[in-house]
Amino acid sequence: DLHKAIRRQRQMCIRDRYGYDISKQAINVAKENAKLNDVPAIFERSNLFEDVADETFDVIVSNPPYIRSDEIPFLMPEVSEFEPHEALDGKEDGLFFYRKIIQESPDYLTDGGYLLFEIGYDQGWAVSSMMKEAGFEDVCVKKDLARNDRVVCGHKHLCEKRG
């Protein structure tokens, strides 16, 4: 569960934690959650990697918008009425942001660094295939408690710099 994961992360020897989001509201919520859970972190506004300094990261975790544009009108009201549209819309096929992040992330990952995504239940194959095609290694899909594909992860090949 999330609370256990946060507690475990607090105990790990992690030097710096950064959080980026295009939404100011999401950043404020993240700051409050970090404070409540005593997790030191720096949160900044950025559209993907646009405003990320020349940093490299050991791990990048992303939960991008992944719902296809044509599915949004049919979402449950508790989702569509309360979540900002930009937090939901993954464009035409729901994979737009995965493509961008997979393409750009190697420039921001240390050699051997990990990229992890939350995905929609039907996107495991597509996202894992894109990561493999981009040169990520040991790509795997993890299931959630309902046994749906939920996370795709892989690591950057050692000594590879894209550009």
Residue ranges, per PLM feature:
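Single conserved hydrophobic/aromatic residue that forms the stacking wall/gate
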Residues: D1-R10, I14-D16
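S-adenosylmethionine
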Residues: Y18-R162
